[in-house]
């Protein structure tokens, strides 16, 4: 979205100058979003939740199911594609949300407290997925208050009162 103050560029373009259509395209194709509360549509199966961004991205109907199934398999949910969100654990729902965020192959993944509602086992599974994405060359921007989750990162930017107070590489204490 457009900044309320300051400016930033994405792919060399000033974001404030993009049209609404260009912003929508950018959100759909270049950035994948993962939320703490999953934001899955409760009346859609795991498969249909993952297909949804491809509908908005004008992916051919024939290709949608194949890509969605592959993405769900890649996060370990190949056997849950027909399940509804209410039939899945929190960790499974978060992996569906990750599959949905990745299905259009974005270069950037933004995750807002993606493990905040998960148990420790599911947290490790989800963080391993993000670590693998980083190894594949994706940019992963993750917001967390959990030190053990933050320690998966190779760079840390700490915000205090809306300003950057620290920016460093390495592990947190």
Language-model segments: which ranges?
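ABC family nucleotide-binding domain
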Residues: 1-159
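H-loop (His-switch) and adjacent beta-strand-loop-beta switch element
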Residues: 156-168
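ABC ATPase nucleotide-binding domains
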Residues: 171-173
